[in-house]
């Protein structure tokens, strides 16, 4: 979208008071219209959502209520109340966003014949541990094991479910884990929401989500599971129970049982097992070593695939498509303030994450073409900045002197 004086003139014809145009974005307003939100939400709700979204695309943003207030005619406490306890239908935005993600990804699969990937993982939004005397500590924050940091990390744990096809990657759900329901059950519930994809499709996950319950639920929805596997899982070669790591040690005495395969320019020795696991029948398990670390126990990686028709290379190539969710987490922390927001209530946090997901969606698909998040983020930032320049220009033309101009735009 190119912002011009003509598009600005169209915007000003909407009877938005001149003093409020500095806190308005016609680009973001048009996104609300596409989602039919303007018919369901009051002007108050639309204005609060717009203030938060504008803030996200302004340089220096770190998720604080003061950031929102800078782009709103309301006090920061008013916006905090809107997130934490305001009465508005946030499930409407969540459901509308989910339907749009499904439509885009499934349409791409039907058009190209390429698989839909449902990708699941979790991350920690790190927070400072409050004093034991804190009167109002952040809700639903706990210590979680951070595999990235290799230690316990205090904060909110988010379970993300993304849908991907042919390079288009969109966030479908971003769920706050609060120990009232297991992460396995969270993912299982989301899986049940998904319509059957139009082509052969796959659920991609790390070893924490490879469970019989999840595998079976996704199978019913039309997704085969491809996931990492812990090396202590039990296999049944020739009907005998054996740990995966023990079997790998026996097989890796010689290279003859392994094939050398190349994935993304890197070489691996891979052994292909087909058979049963505990609670899982007739699956493929790949034992993998980097070419230069063959036979080393700490270098062993294992992968499960429930589609036995796939070749070894196809399994590994598909599993690599799980990586965008890691990139998504980094983008949320670097650009969307996932690690730095200051919101206390669980409801406010869930609502902020929903708005954050909407911002990510806009960056990927709403700038005139499907593009990487970073590209879309900078495009929208430029659009909003140009809109502000045009607003200031219009205000200056309407004011008789500098003092009246300051009163309007301050």
Residue spans for each PLM region:
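Single, function-defining residue in the core of a domain
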Residues: 2-36, 45, 49, 113, ...
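A residue-level signal for conserved active-site and pocket-lining positions in enzyme catalytic cores
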Residues: 68, 161, 358
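Generic structural signal for well-ordered alpha-helical scaffold segments
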Residues: 54, 102-106, 162, 188-195
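Long, contiguous hydrophobic alpha-helical segments, chiefly transmembrane helices and signal peptides
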Residues: 79-82, 119, 158, 208, ...
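Active-site-proximal, Lys/Arg-enriched surface segment
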Residues: 85-166, 266-274
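Short N-terminal helix-initiation segments at or just after the protein's N-terminus
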Residues: 51-66, 99-106, 143-151, 245-251, ...
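Gly/serine-rich nucleotide phosphate-binding loop at the start of the catalytic core
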Residues: 1-93, 97-98
